[in-house]
Regions:
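Active-site neighborhood of HAD-like aspartate-dependent phosphohydrolases
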Residues: 1-53
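Residue-level signature of catalytic and energy-coupling elements of molecular machines
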Residues: 15, 77, 115
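Hydrophobic packing residues within well-ordered alpha-helices of enzyme cores
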Residues: 26, 97, 122-126
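Conserved alpha/beta cores of soluble small-molecule-handling proteins
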Residues: 35-36, 52-56, 74-76, 95, ...
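Short, compositionally biased "basic patch" segments
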Residues: 47-53, 62-74, 133-134, 138
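Metal-dependent phosphoesterase signature
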Residues: 60-96
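Short, acidic loop-to-helix structural element flanking the phosphoryl-transfer center
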Residues: 82-119
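Substrate-recognition/cap helix-loop segment adjacent to the acidic, metal-dependent catalytic center
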Residues: 106, 110, 117-141
Length: 141
């Protein structure tokens, strides 16, 4: 029996494996493709102002951010997830943390990615870095 298969390494995504918040990059990606209305951007900026001052809870901030997906088809976003990963996320992976991911993979440990971000944005990361499990936000459609 391989004892290493019973060891798991857990990695947080935002501001750990990824040097920045993925939500900001996601909004930038949507904005660059003209897929997000200006009103939504304004709403996020105002909410973020209050969130940064701890006047808005994590839960409320997430609810505000997720309003973007209301009445939209998830498949439209899933189609661009791989390109988003390659262009926006992969270049911002933290080298030191990435080295730890590779170390644990080489040791035969299970790799678990944890994030509050949505699944479709994280699946390309999981595939590319060969994570074994993903714990994240699933959108209800």
């Amino acid at each position: 029996m391989n004892l290493n298969s019973h060891i798991a390494a857990f990695f947080d995504f935002d501001e750990t494996l990824l040097e920045v918040e993925s939500g900001k990059l996601g909004i930038q990606w949507l904005w660059d493709r003209r897929l997000v209305p200006f009103g939504y951007i304004l709403k996020i900026l105002v909410a973020n102002f209050f969130y940064q001052r701890r006047l808005l809870s994590d839960e409320r901030m997430v609810k505000i951010m997720l309003t973007f997906y209301k009445k939209k088809r998830l498949t439209d976003f899933q189609k661009g997830a791989e390109n988003f990963y390659k262009a926006y996320l992969k270049p911002r992976l933290a080298p030191g943390i990435l080295a730890r991911v590779h170390f644990h993979k080489n040791e035969g440990h299970l790799l678990v990615l944890i994030s509050g971000s949505v699944r479709y944005l994280l699946e390309p990361v999981v595939r590319d870095l060969e994570f074994d499990h993903l714990l994240c936000t699933d959108l209800e459609v």
